[in-house]
Amino acid sequence: MAAKKDYYAILGVPRNATQEEIKRAYKRLARQYHPDVNKSPEAEEKFKEINEAYAVLSDPEKRRIYDTYGTTEAPPPPPPGGYDFSGFDVEDFSEFFQELFGPGLFGGFGRRSRKGRDLRAELPLTLEEAFHGGERVVEVAGRRVSVRIPPGVREGSVIRVPGMGGQGNPPGDLLLVVRLLPHPVFRLEGQDLYATLDVPAPIAVVGGKVRAMTLEGPVEVAVPPRTQAGRKLRLKGKGFPGPAGRGDLYLEVRITIPERLTPEEEALWKKLAEAYYARA
């Protein structure tokens, strides 16, 4: 049996942490260990572990079960007052003896096909997983199930896995409801992505190129001269995929100034300030 994970320790929060504290810790760690930012060998595994912990602790019901049992699956409760045979089905009895002695002996019971119940479960995904799609192995009711995730899947989308639900003839299906985890960099609205772009003050004034992150990796973005803070730069076709094509990525400019200056750089900034005051 795999060792139980301490999700609170993974996120670095106490067991009585509020949802807001859990969310802040998740965002901080996700930003620190995001594979596009952190190139250390263990970053990708750590990033997955952080997302797994947040998927449980951010859900009140999953957190309650985890706090009670140390796992996300609660054991079935014992039947109160002994065993109850009120749900006994003659069909099940018939099928049992037909398996032992063949269909002829107990054919009088009759046998009807009854489809198994559909099972519903939550599927937490990072934006990267939802964007790229691919294969994912999930554990539901003690079973490991391979799931194909279509690219561009959205919050609330339902992925149906045929035949992996409740027992029956035929078996029911497994319905996985997509839940997108918060991302430390991007915000998804419709098919469009939104993020902040840090632009050094000199480049904002005279124009130039800066590096920006997308869900497909880093790209260079052209910054027009005299770009003001708050301006949105649009990267066409860099958003989420959908039936009508790709959405766009909007980068909101945030002007940054250097925290440390060499004597020469400070002298240049002073000259710029003097020129500004002289013109004003």
Curated annotation (Swiss-Prot):
Localization terms from the record: Cytoplasm
Please provide, in alphabetical order, the Gene Ontology terms of the cellular component aspect for this entry. Answer: cytoplasm
For the biological process aspect of GO, one term held by this record is: DNA replication
The record's listing under Pfam families reads: DnaJ (PF00226), DnaJ_C (PF01556)
Q: Which UniProt keywords apply?
A: Chaperone, Cytoplasm, DNA replication, Stress response
Mainly localized where? cytoplasm
**Entry's Gene Ontology molecular function annotations:** unfolded protein binding
List the PANTHER family. Answer: DNAJ HOMOLOG 1, MITOCHONDRIAL-RELATED
Q: What is this protein called?
A: Chaperone protein DnaJ 2
